[in-house]
Amino acid sequence: MATKLFPKFSQGLAQDPTTRRIWYGLAMAHDFESHDGMTEENLYQKIFASHFGQLSIIFLWTSGNLFHVAWQGNFEQWVTDPVHIRPIAHAIWDPHFGQPAVEAFTRGGASGPVNISTSGVYQWWYTIGMRTNQDLYVGSVFLALVSAIFLFAGWLHLQPNFQPSLSWFKDAESRLNHHLSGLFGVSSLAWTGHLVHVAIPESRGQHVGWDNFLSVLPHPQGLTPFFTGNWAAYAQSPDTASHVFGTAQGSGQAILTFLGGFHPQTQSLWLTDMAHHHLAIAVIFIVAGHMYRTNFGIGHRMQAILEAHTPPSGSLGAGHKGLFDTVNNSLHFQLGLALASVGTITSLVAQHMYSLPPYAFQAIDFTTQAALYTHHQYIAGFIMCGAFAHGAIFFIRDYDPEQNKGNVLARMLDHKEALISHLSWVSLFLGFHTLGLYVHNDVMQAFGTPEKQILIEPVFAQWIQAAHGKALYGFDFLLSSKTSAAFANGQSLWLPGWLDAINNNQNSLFLTIGPGDFLVHHAIALGLHTTTLILVKGALDARGSKLMPDKKDFGYSFPCDGPGRGGTCDISAYDAFYLAVFWMLNTIGWVTFYWHWKHLTLWQGNVAQFDESSTYLMGWLRDYLWLNSSQLINGYNPFGMNSLSVWAWTFLFGHLIYATGFMFLISWRGYWQELIETLVWAHEKTPLANLVYWKDKPVALSIVQARLVGLAHFSVGYIFTYAAFLIASTSGRFG
C-alpha cells in the first residue's frame, strides 16, 4: 500500500515506522539516482532544471547585496574618500542593544548601528564605474529580474514539452563549443566592453551612463586603429603615475595596455591592463569554442583525440581508449572533474586577489584582504574534497572494467598500491622532519640557547623570486640581473611596471621569505599530502581492497559488514572523505595562520616579529594566536563593551559549535540508542506526558549519519571561531 508520507521518492523509506524515515529521507533527497522509478533521461532533466534554480538564488543574493548597500550603506560618501571612510554593509536592528552597543556600532558616518563591509564589494563597484546609489539600485532591480527569469526557466524545463532529450545532454562537443565560446568567450568580451566603455572613462572623470554611452568615444580615434591594423595606438598615452583615480588629473587615453605593476594611488592593477587581459581571454576562448566537430563535419572529435592518445612505446597500455564514453556517461566523473577545476581556481583566486589586487583601494583595506583570502581558501578546500568524493562514487556506481580494459584509468587502479604507499611515505617524511625541526627549535628557545636553532634559508624559492625580478637576495639572475635580455625587454616591452612592483615593500607581491617561511611551507605541504593521501586512497580503494574485495557492493557509505568480518569498519569511501575533511581544515588553518600573521607584521611595519617567532611552535601559539586574541577576549568585560563585542561573542559561540561536534564524533550509536530507549520508557511511564505519542518510533542516527552531524558541527564551529578571530584581530588593530 502506497503511503503519502515523506519521502515521496522512496516508498520503502516512506513506510519505515521509525525516525529513520526522516533522516534517511533527508540524506537521500539529492541522490536522484536512487529514487523510485528514476530513468537516466529524467535524472539529467532534473539536474538540468535545478541548475536554473541555483543561478536564480545566486542572482537574488547579488541583487540583495546591491539593494542593501544602496538603501542602508554609505557608498556615495565612501566614493569621496575611500581611504578613510569605512564602507557600510547594512544597518543592524537589534532589540537587545543597550545605549553602549548603539554607540559602539554607529560608525562610518551612519545615524544608527551598522555592519562594516569586509567583502570588497565597495571597491569592486567603484572600480567598474559605479558612483551613485542610483547605479546600485538599477543593478539590483536588473539582477532581481534576471533571477525571476532563471526561476521561470527552471520551471519551464521541467514541463514535458520543454525537457531536453538524453541525446542532447550527451552531446559533449556542442556543449563544449557553446560553453567555451558563449560562456567564457563572449562573456569575457562583454566584460572587456564594459571596462573600456564605462569603467576606464569613469576612472578618468568622464561619466558614462545609459544617457550617453552611445555618444562617448572610449578612445579619441574610435575604431579606426582597429580596422587599419594600427592596434598599438590603443596602448599609447596610458595613465601616468600621478593619475588621481576617478578624475582627469594625470590621466591618459590608452584603453588596452601592458604596463604591469600597480596604480600608485589605488595600489590596484591598471584598469587598462585588465581590459587587455579580458580581451585576450575572449579571443582565445571564442577560437577554442570552434574546435569541436558538430553540424558541419569540420573540427575535432573528442573521442578521436582521446583514442589517438596512445604512446607508441606502449608504456600507457591502451592509452585513453574508452575514456570518452566513460566520462560522457558518468555524471559523477563529470562533476568530479568540474569540482577539481573549480576548487583549484578558487584557491588561485585567493592567492591572486591579495598579491595582485584588481580593485581600487582594496590593498589598503586590510580586514577585507584577510577576509577574502581566508574565505576563498576554505571554499577551495571543501570543493576539492567534493571532487574526490564524486570520483569515488564514480568508481562504485559508474566504472565499467570491461569498457576501460588496459587504459590509463584501469592502470591507475592496477598500480594503486604504489601511488598510496608513495603518498604515505611523503606524508611521513614531511611530518617527522617538519615537526622535528619545530620541536628542536622550541627546546633551544626553552633552554636559553636560541642561537642553536636549526634555521634553513629557502634558497630555491628565493632563487625563483629572483628570477622574477626580486633584487633583495642578490642572485643576479634573469629579471633581477641588469645585464640579462629578460631585464632589457621587461623594461621596454613586457610589463615595464613589474620590477617596481616586485621590489616595493608596500605590497604583497613576492614577499621576502626566510627560515620561518621554509618551516611553515613544509607544514602546509604535510597537510596537503596527507589530505591527498586520504582522498586518493578513498577513491582508489572504493571498489575493493585486499581486506574487502567486494566493497563496491556495499555502496559509497557503510559503517561495517557486521561482526562477522572484523576490521571492515571505517573503510567505506565516505569514511575517507570524512577523515580527509578534518585534514583539509587542519591544512587551511595552517595556510591562513601563515598568511594572516605574515601580513599583520607586514602591515604594522614589524616583519621581524614573524621572522623571529615563526621558527618554533611556542612563537606561533604565543605571538600569533594569544597576542592577537587579546582584542577578542576584551570585546566585552565587566567595564563595558566595544564594537568588537559581536566578534568576541561569535568566537565563544564558534567554540561551542565546534565542541558539540565531538559529542557525535566520539560516542557511537549504541550509546544514543540506549539513552533514547530509556527516555522512551520514562515518557511512557509519565502521566499526562504519555497522552502525547509519536508516529515514528524514535531510534538513534546511524553511525554514518552521526559522523556527518559531528563533521558539520566541527567544520562550522572551526570556521566561525577563526572568522571571528581574523576579523576582530585585524579590524581591532587597523580600524
From Swiss-Prot:
Residues bound to chlorophyll a B1: 655
- Which residues does the annotation say bind chlorophyll a B3? 663, 671
Compartments in which it is found: Plastid, Chloroplast thylakoid membrane
Q: Which GO terms describe its biological process?
A: photosynthesis
* Pfam family name, one: PsaA_PsaB
Q: Which residues participate in phylloquinone binding?
A: 672
Q: Please tell me whether the keyword Zinc is annotated for this protein.
A: no
Annotated effect of mutating residue 559 to A/L: Assembles functional PSI. Reaction center is somewhat unstable and interaction with PsaC is impaired. The L mutant is less stable than the A mutant
Electron transport found in the keyword field: yes
Subunit structure, interactors included: The PsaA/B heterodimer binds the P700 chlorophyll special pair and subsequent electron acceptors. PSI consists of a core antenna complex that captures photons, and an electron transfer chain that converts photonic excitation into a charge separation. The eukaryotic PSI reaction center is composed of at least 11 subunits.
Protein name, please?
Photosystem I P700 chlorophyll a apoprotein A2
Organism per entry: Chlamydomonas reinhardtii
Task: Name the gene behind this protein.
Answer: psaB
